Amino acid sequence: MLDKLTIKNVALIETAEIDFGAGLNVLSGETGSGKSVILDSINFVLGAKADKSMIRHGETECSVCAVFRCGAAVQALLSDMGLDADEEVIVFRKYKSDGRGDIKVNGNPVNAAMLRKITAHLVDVH
């Protein structure tokens, strides 16, 4: 379950921190208020491809950090991958205007394929 999302320099968002509650969470608001940016940020931290257009105008990089609560199956997967396994999974992803980026899971560097394998077990976006 997604507990917290921190977004920095993504599209029109300079900094945003969102705490999600248990159960169903709904994003609502007027046109242009940033709902799609939040969904794009979630997809980005889950492993979707990034491009320069997502970086806020005037900045050189953007980042998204997501905190998930997970069960034993995800903990076992993390352990099998040689990563720190706990009830909390922290996924951090940064993308720079030069096309480079960093991905970390619980502070450990991972590649995009590993990220997608892990996050496939953490959240469903509909």
Task: Give the role of each language-model region.
Residues 3-126:
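Gly/Lys-enriched N-terminal cap/neck module of very large, oligomeric protein machines
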